[in-house]
Curated annotation (Swiss-Prot):
Entry function: Forms oxaloacetate, a four-carbon dicarboxylic acid source for the tricarboxylic acid cycle.
Keywords: Carbon dioxide fixation, Lyase, Magnesium
Cofactor(s) named in the record: Mg(2+)
Reactions listed under catalytic activity: oxaloacetate + phosphate = phosphoenolpyruvate + hydrogencarbonate
Organism: Escherichia coli O1:K1 / APEC
This protein's record includes keyword Nucleotide-binding: no
GO cellular component term of the entry, any: cytosol
Taxonomic superkingdom: Bacteria
The protein's name: Phosphoenolpyruvate carboxylase
Amino acid sequence: MNEQYSALRSNVSMLGKVLGETIKDALGEHILERVETIRKLSKSSRAGNDANRQELLTTLQNLSNDELLPVARAFSQFLNLANTAEQYHSISPKGEAASNPEVIARTLRKLKNQPELSEDTIKKAVESLSLELVLTAHPTEITRRTLIHKMVEVNACLKQLDNKDIADYEHNQLMRRLRQLIAQSWHTDEIRKLRPSPVDEAKWGFAVVENSLWQGVPNYLRELNEQLEENLGYKLPVEFVPVRFTSWMGGDRDGNPNVTADITRHVLLLSRWKATDLFLKDIQVLVSELSMVEATPELLALVGEEGAAEPYRYLMKNLRSRLMATQAWLEARLKGEELPKPEGLLTQNEELWEPLYACYQSLQACGMGIIANGDLLDTLRRVKCFGVPLVRIDIRQESTRHTEALGELTRYLGIGDYESWSEADKQAFLIRELNSKRPLLPRNWQPSAETREVLDTCQVIAEAPQGSIAAYVISMAKTPSDVLAVHLLLKEAGIGFAMPVAPLFETLDDLNNANDVMTQLLNIDWYRGLIQGKQMVMIGYSDSAKDAGVMAASWAQYQAQDALIKTCEKAGIELTLFHGRGGSIGRGGAPAHAALLSQPPGSLKGGLRVTEQGEMIRFKYGLPEITVSSLSLYTGAILEANLLPPPEPKESWRRIMDELSVISCDVYRGYVRENKDFVPYFRSATPEQELGKLPLGSRPAKRRPTGGVESLRAIPWIFAWTQNRLMLPAWLGAGTALQKVVEDGKQNELEAMCRDWPFFSTRLGMLEMVFAKADLWLAEYYDQRLVDKALWPLGKELRNLQEEDIKVVLAIANDSHLMADLPWIAESIQLRNIYTDPLNVLQAELLHRSRQAEKEGQEPDPRVEQALMVTIAGIAAGMRNTG
């Protein structure tokens, strides 16, 4: 174990040394000395030296405004380098990869050893695998794209340096390259100057596809195929690609007025353009590779006399011409030119697939399987995974926008006000109109801008090539009419196919009512006819946790899923649950394997569809090798959950969860909603107000410009508490509820739940991880520097609560200390704390200076503001998650 860490530690210290030299070259010895002193004090403070902790606080308080930025940047950049070293460690032969035998192989062996599972059953489960990852542009990816590229290169250098047989000359060249990259990063501004537009966000998503997924997906499938051959003697069919990517970038307009119908249209075109660009590179390679002459009669008939000399090349060159014509047309459309569609325009995946597959079959039949299974197979798999649209997009809009649009329409038509009708009247009207042959929208009607936007979006969906839009997600869905309304608006736009429409249930009440809503919908004959036995439902993690606290929210999510699975099974409907979880614990994030196995039995039968948010995209898919490992983890977890589902929880366990849910929700809301001191405390003890200044995502931080916690989006709410290290949303209420149930004499039951019920043990594991990242002395320091003395008792109360919570969680889990069974994560947190602590202390100091200046009516010092932004980004890197 320790040898593993020593490889990581030596890389971290080597990168730190190079950064130190860079700082010295740029700013001189005295700044480096200052940074070194702070680092040593922080290390000693972490080891429990109180005198050094005091000295650390004093040193950072006494920095001049000129020293603030270099010190903040030094620690922030160091954390980015530490994260890069850790990312490399997870795929390096000396690191985690060495002690972590192949996930898929391990899963297959485990399944083979179950007497009740035949090899045929396992094969069928593999063939029904379905994994859809939905990339979202959450404003949590703080790191700029240019810096991400540099870190990818640093990673490549670390990989080459690991080679034992490397010559001295090469070693020196690599070290020089590392120094260049770290110097480039140091001299680059790490904070974006402007908020990204939705199109910028979409381009960020395409960059992930190009730099990592394009290579990672075929590599993952080779890995999967190899393991299946080895363990089951079974080859994957060529057309079998269980993974798809969808994006919310450019499609998610919920609370983001910057995403309009025009933007969505533009992003759809841009996505297709990027696909032609990437496939052209692939086809270019195949043109030079496939110089073979021998071919089957079928292939020769396909190419005719003209192509008989080099049939494979002939087909590839034809495909290349079509791709080039398609790309030119898309480019003109992106510039706003209206052109007729050229002949041979590629709009469907089959048009890409057919010529490639014809080559594949012919090569196989002529005994050239080794060639067929090379680059050609990778390209075929990319056609299945990415295809003509590259990534499909989801459209997401809030339910009230559809209700308002229909209200405006019914008032114009003089048939009443849809908005004020009862649910029964709304449903009757919607079903009547959905069955009607005549259009509902009058020709000469001039709706308001808001309604026009909703109708235009439906128009974009109707006109887009089928298959480029994956689903229409309705946020804040509450009733059956919310779903029917969208179907009616799409029908009016002239959509020619049944678009999957997914209600998103995201508050505690909505989760509790989700099953009733879906049961009513499935009882409508028209609706059953439309969906053809398939239904998608999205479960919201972040908003339910913000509404009720993590314990109550996670139980409501579990029960909603459980009930929906049973309802759909009874009705013969294939249900896909779409999980909207975030990167941080308060937004439902958890290590993938544990999270999936902790869901109700049967929840992955319809495949897994899950959002991958902001900063997590980089941690899980930032490099092709990491993509392979993330996709393998998901694959193993889905197979295991479907073939060896967790047991149904005992009735007594469900009753305990009901109890925990009620108590924890009361405690959570008692503070967050009912304590009059809470909002002023939150505003002053965290950088919540300053966060609004960070040019992160294209979406505003608040749903409504004024208002308390409930109007804040879930992300800034969690981000703010992560910054001051109290991590409040991820634990408040949970420990108090556990303590109460222990006092009622049920500790043995809780211990049994922890042992035998993955759902419950995952909850406790996530609490432990949060507590390991939280730091009470830092949270207290924020109070002392920033909070009015009258509010200090509330801060103290919350910190005491956390201390009590830690004790009760450890007692139930039977652990002597936090993260006892995940030493690798504990090690990683400790490694980073030494560098994150000074950033926290500095941030409290900067907030103090910035607010002081504001109080005195002075203009804020730009050096203070800039350094503050850097500490926010640095702490986010140190915590490995933002909001």
